[in-house]
Amino acid sequence: MERTIAVVTGASSGLGKEFAKLLVRRKEIDEVWAIARRKDKLTELKKELGEKIIPFSVDLSDAGQIISWQQALEKQKPDIRYLINDAGFAKFCSYLDLSIEDSLNMIHVNCDAVVAMTLSCLPYMNAKSKILNISSQASFQPLPYLNLYSATKAFIRHYSRALNVELEERGIQVTAVCPGWMMTHLYGRATVGAKKGTHKFYGMKKPGPVARKALKDADLYKDMSVYSLYVKGSHLGAKLLPHRLVMKLWLYQQKL
């Protein structure tokens, strides 16, 4: 009998790990293919969550490694029920502190890799399969000193919602998950070396509840998942107010 698979990128920590925890508990999922760069973290994850975890060490900023992943899929031809594109890269700073290398890595991991993972997994997905792409509250409007990160997350939100319409005929659901600030290592790493940048993270939440709501919303065939009243208020404000004003309010909040 064909194994049913959930694929989770960025699975070794943070929100990705919370998704992995939830998916291993689902009886309909035989294996969770956990993708991350660090083999040691993946080994720890397997010890913690059990035999359902199948680790794959893949650097999603490397196109060659993504192609190797695609070739592994072609050999195994799994029945993919869930694809969670959680892997992300962030630098919260002025353009002056953002190198060309970091800029391109952010685009590769946050945008290119999501598209590549989605296209590589779609041939092995069927009706009722789910794709959850992690966008952000930052996607709702342009954000100075978060300019590239917010732009990559806006790409993910629009890509996911448009793709969801295209995949309706196949019965595959795509959900853009738009969390606010979360208690993960991403934010500590993102501010390292920034002389001037984002440093006030209001409405910080634990990633577990965000993951639970995201899966629930995907199962309810919602094309967006927004957790917490704070983030919902931010979304409404970004729709009602001119973005020039929203950016000024953002700068005032961050004291920039």
Region roles according to the model:
Residues 12-13:
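Conserved glycine-rich cofactor-binding loop
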Residues 118, 152:
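Active-site helix of classical SDR
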Residues 24, 28-44:
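Conserved glycine-rich Rossmann-like NAD(P)H-binding loop of the short-chain dehydrogenase/reductase
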Residues 136:
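Residue(s) in the substrate-gating loop at a strand-loop-helix junction
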Residues 94-95, 102-107:
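Substrate-binding pocket helix/loop in short-chain dehydrogenase/reductase
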Residues 86-91:
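Conserved NAD(P)H cofactor-binding loop of Rossmann-fold oxidoreductase domains
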Residues 169-229:
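SDR active-site lid
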